[in-house]
């Protein structure tokens, strides 16, 4: 049955441990003998070759080795896993794009690709900023929670009700001025918040001011009010709220 499927298919995708397909008699040479035009995509934890190829891998391993968890967490806190194990879906999405590209390339060139997708590399594609920061400065970036390295405010703030939150972010002085006018009529002219550098320097105080304003308001009310004046804000949605 498998040979019949391979003979009439465009792509074979496997997510076995390294060497399993060959042990089953369906390594790339055997697959190509059945169908010379078959595209083969092999998904693994650490790639099909190299010193780590045979290591065990689950989703958290990809985030650890790629540096994602080292960049995740609050100031002064430990490295933290993300809310979902991004390595699993991330590897699948990376493979899907690679297969689509391979199909297009085969149409143009007649060459069938063999694709090697590792979970570590898939996760690493999401960690560009910390890597570049290290290359530029020689220092490991500090964990900053929900904050941004440059912009403030940039945080998830408490709203009224149980476990309700709303994200608010400003990346220009104009956006800040509009937000500040809503928070306090005198705040737009406050010297300690006038520029992006000022706001970042006084971020802790700024977060306290915004939290004091949001905590007594419905998270949707906050989002709609701020979106109406061109400030990026949206409630943090739980699975229950989404359903």
Predicted regions and their residues:
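A structured beta-alpha segment of the ubiquitous adenosine-cofactor-binding alpha/beta core
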Residues: 1-33, 215
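Conserved N-terminal glycine/acidic-rich loop preference
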Residues: 9-15, 50-54, 201
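Residue-level detector of anion-binding/catalytic polar loops
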Residues: 11-12, 37, 112, 232
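Hydrophobic residues in well-ordered beta-strands that form the structural core
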Residues: 14-15, 40-42, 235
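Active-site-adjacent "lid/gating" segments in soluble enzymes
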Residues: 22-165, 169-170
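Beta-rich nucleic-acid/ligand-interaction surfaces
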Residues: 123, 202, 241-243
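Aromatic-enriched alpha-helical interface/lid elements that frame and gate functional surfaces
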Residues: 153-233
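Conserved PLP-binding catalytic core of the aspartate aminotransferase-like
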Residues: 208, 235-243
């Amino acid at each position: 049955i498998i040979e019949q499927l391979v003979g009439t298919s465009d792509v074979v995708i496997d997510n076995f441990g390294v060497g399993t397909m060959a042990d089953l008699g369906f390594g790339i040479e055997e697959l190509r003998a059945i169908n010379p035009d078959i595209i083969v995509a092999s998904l693994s934890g650490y790639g099909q070759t190299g010193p780590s190829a045979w290591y065990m891998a689950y989703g958290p391993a990809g985030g650890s080795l790629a540096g994602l968890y080292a960049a995740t967490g609050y100031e002064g806190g430990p490295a933290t896993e993300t809310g979902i194990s991004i390595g699993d879906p991330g590897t699948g999405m990376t493979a899907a794009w690679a297969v689509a590209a391979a199909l297009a390339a085969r149409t143009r060139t007649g060459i069938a690709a063999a694709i090697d997708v590792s979970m570590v590399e898939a996760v690493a594609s999401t960690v560009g900023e910390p890597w570049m920061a290290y290359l530029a400065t020689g220092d490991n970036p500090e964990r900053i929670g929900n904050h941004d390295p440059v912009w403030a405010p940039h945080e998830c703030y408490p709203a009224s009700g149980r476990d309700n939150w709303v994200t608010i972010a400003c990346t220009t002085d104009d956006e800040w001025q509009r937000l500040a006018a809503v928070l306090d009529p005198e705040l737009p002219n406050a010297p300690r918040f006038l520029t992006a550098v000022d706001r970042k320097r006084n971020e802790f105080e700024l977060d306290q001011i915004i939290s004091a304003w949001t905590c007594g308001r419905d998270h949707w009310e906050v989002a709609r009010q701020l979106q109406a004046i061109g400030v990026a804000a949206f409630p943090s949605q739980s699975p229950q709220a989404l359903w």
